[in-house]
């Protein structure tokens, strides 16, 4: 009986991030696309500024990488989030499952692992579908900074 009850507990509640299989780890990604928006770094302060400019490999409508398996060939600067480097990514969105679980929190109600699809996430406007622009359309990157410093507001 106890064994049956254990199987009803979702893996993200019964395992640490380190204990998860690669498939479980990958499934935590809600596919919001926020990681795939370009970030700019202030050369003087190292502060990170978020833009609404999508990576060339991001399909803005689906919020999925066009070449996920080969993304590093197409985009050498693409960032690979791993169990080891997770603590160094302070910029991850507050809604990111990796961040939430690392902080001992649960997945949000709209997460695709709970709802079975990305529809609720898109409905909550968590994904970049509603704000992202194509890199090829950008003239002045600074016009696309979302979290401008006080002096630039």
Curated annotation (Swiss-Prot):
A family per Pfam: CxxCxxCC
Name of the molecule in the record: UPF0260 protein YcgN
Signal peptide: none
Gene field: ycgN
Stored InterPro entries: Puta_zinc/iron-chelating_dom, UCP006173
Family per similarity comment: Belongs to the UPF0260 family.
């Amino acid at each position: 009986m106890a064994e049956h009850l254990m199987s009803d507990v979702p893996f993200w509640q019964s395992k640490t991030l380190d204990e998860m299989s690669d498939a479980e780890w990958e499934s935590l990604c809600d596919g919001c696309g926020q990681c795939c928006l370009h970030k700019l770094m202030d050369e003087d302060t190292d502060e990170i500024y978020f833009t609404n400019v999508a990576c060339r490999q991001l399909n803005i409508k689906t919020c999925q990488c066009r070449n996920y398996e080969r993304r590093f060939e197409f985009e050498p600067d693409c960032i690979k989030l791993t169990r080891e480097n997770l603590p160094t990514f302070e910029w991850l969105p507050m809604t990111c499952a990796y961040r939430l679980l690392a902080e001992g929190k649960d997945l949000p109600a709209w997460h695709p692992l709970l709802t079975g699809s990305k529809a609720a996430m898109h409905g909550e406007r968590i994904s970049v579908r509603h704000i992202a622009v194509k890199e090829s359309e950008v003239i002045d990157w600074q016009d696309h900074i979302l979290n401008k410093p006080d002096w630039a507001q």
